[in-house]
Amino acid sequence: MHVEGVRNWLLKVGLQTTDLECGSHWPSHQESAHTMIADGVFHQAEHNNCSGKHAGFLTLALQLGYPHKNYIQPDHPVQLRVKEVLEKSCDVELSKNEPAIDGCSVPTWAMPLENIAIGMARWGTRSKLDPEFCKASEIISKAMVLHPHLVAGQGRCCTRVLSHFKGKVLVK
């Protein structure tokens, strides 16, 4: 489901899985990985657990008129926008820090746990959230509740919690 979803998403915006810059790895869902190995299928970028996030980065680049190549670079307009949203949401300044690169090749910003909690609370409740982010928060929250299997995958803790609480709790 994850792989087909990413492929279809990219096709809808006029891109291909070769545009993903997340790298590839075997699915964390062991049954899927074993099936691929048994079938002689080697993992591609669309099998990366973060390929959906990367499809989102690519879509954002296209919607805002930015080039979609090199979207994972810290100085790319997409990543600068991500940094800006984090700063506003988490009430933290990140420009003095150098980002680390996470397991799927995107800049990852260190910040105090308190600021992460502030950001999560703001996005979860929309209280004290920058007004320009409120609609996005509502859309994301509804999507997570309606499609918990797309948040983390089959059998994952996040998926089970979202499915069980049906909108009363948001986790990722």
Language-model segments: which ranges?
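Short helix-capping and hinge/turn segments at secondary-structure transitions, especially at repeat
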Residues: 91-92, 118-129, 145-153
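Charged, low-complexity surface segments at secondary-structure and domain boundaries
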Residues: 67-72, 125-131
